Amino acid sequence: MKRRELLDNALDRAALGVVVSSAVELSDLWSVALSLSASEPTRPTPIDAEDSISRERTADGYAMTYEWTDRPGRKWCLEFSIERSAYREAADKAHGYLSGFEAAKASSHAERLTEALADVSVTGERAWRSLPESVRLERAIGFVRSFKYVTDAESTGAPEYIRTVEETLVDGCGDCEDLTYLLVGILSQPAFSYRTAMVILPGHMLAAVHRDDLPAAYADAPTLPGGAYVAIECTTSRPIGDFQDEPVLAVYGDGIEYIDQSSITDTGWRFVQDPTQFQTIADASEGRPH
């Protein structure tokens, strides 16, 4: 079962002792074990009628309609279908944070979605392909930010559940990790071919793009620690390069791009209390000198 595989992986990572393991009591790990082995989703998350995303069940899948407005105020609409078998197959796969990141970049549905986005146009305007790259990037970011933010506990009943791109597209919602993977999946496709990364903050995750791949309009955007990547928030409407005022613990792109061991040590107990984080930091720290 997906929950059991995640549990075993998480407990193995916790045994590494890289996130101030002395702060963890046995009872805490047992509590995490019980919660991680709780119910897992077997069908799409319900979508509220007032949401900007709607879903219709078809004979062999789901017909999705997405409506969103980007930061400059342009309104967009996209219709996209996903096979029911693809959703179920994705839901049956267990992912940790790093494997979830890699799966998003390799997702065939993310590639098909990006091609569909390329054909979207606003009434009275040119098709998306003919627009400046900066506008195309803002459209993709606006698309991801239109998804409803929900915690895993709210949407699945489990304290931690890593959605694939396919699940997020059908569920129409996700937490910061799910939406980060969705944006990473889009921006990694040939239509953009960006070098992407996931950024770990205390209790939060966001996406990043290599500064050399961004359009010239963002040449002055601040970079993350390490200097190579620029942050993109997926759950809030912040400008590219701007993110919440928290220490950057790790940046993972083509391997570890940056890691702050001292901040991880200083805040490590928070990650152990929050099972959404300790596996990530353990994974990120495993191959680095301590």
What are these regions (language model features)?
Residues 1-2:
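N-terminal secretory signal peptides
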Residues 5-290:
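A structural boundary/capping signal
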